[in-house]
Every structure is written in structure tokens, then in C-alpha cells.
Amino acid sequence: MIHQPFGDYYGTYRAMEEAYKAGKARAIGVSNFYPDRYIDIAHFAEVVPAVNQVETHLFQQQKVAREYLAKHNTQIMSWRPFAEGKNDFFNTPVLKEIGAKYGKSVAQVALRFLLQNGVVVIPKSTHEERMQENFNVFDFVLTED
């Protein structure tokens, strides 16, 4: 995976394609490629990226990026589903209210929202209880109301 579109990322991507074609990689992808850079690489590539890892959360939903990625069958992956806890994320009133409705935490509501919108999530935690909580998001579905 290319972490960011800096330097000779075209050359790096070509090398990754060769590794993929040689069977040395099951998939190749990119990270932090926003729509303009992603379109460049998708049109340049012989093997379209399997995944694009970008900052995606409730406050930055990446709707345009998701549209472009879907057109090219590239999976969007959130590497920051909790916005790093910034902007008092875990105390957002509407998220707390939704969580109370479902008996879930703000983190679980945020993860479920992203999952329901086709976003693969990578929540970060070093606490075992939070890791377990992050897995417990498949027993409810958010509704429009």
C-alpha cells in the first residue's frame, strides 16, 4: 500500500502491480489518495487499487471519494473512524441520543453508520474492553429516524 501520493508514486505503484502480477501480493492499494490523486492512479494503473484508506468519519464522510471509488470497484477504508476523538466526538449529543436508543455507545453508532454506508473501518484502541465494544456492532441497524 502506498501511504501518501508523494514522490514517484506512479513508479511505486507500477512496482506493486508487478508484485501483484507475480503472485507476491494478493491485493494492492493506496492510502490518503483523495479523488484527484485517486483518479490519476486509477487511469494510470493496469491493476486498479483494491482499497483506498482515507480519513473517514461522521464529520468527514468522504461522499465524493466514495462515489469515485465505487465507480472503480475500489473499497474505501476509514483509518480514523472516531475523528481521533477531536471536536468532543464522544460527547456529541445526537450520537449519544442515537446510542441510547439502541443501547450502544457513541463509538458503536459511529462504526455502524460507516459500515452501513459501505466503509471498512479500522478503529484504534489499546484497551481490550473497547476492542470488544468495537466488534459488537453487528447486532443492530441504524434507521432513518
Q: PLM features: residue spans?
A:
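Beta/alpha (TIM)-barrel catalytic core signal, keyed to glycine-rich beta->alpha loops juxtaposed to Asp/Glu
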Residues: 4-145
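N-terminal Rossmann-like NAD(P) cofactor-binding module of classical short-chain dehydrogenase/reductase
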Residues: 1
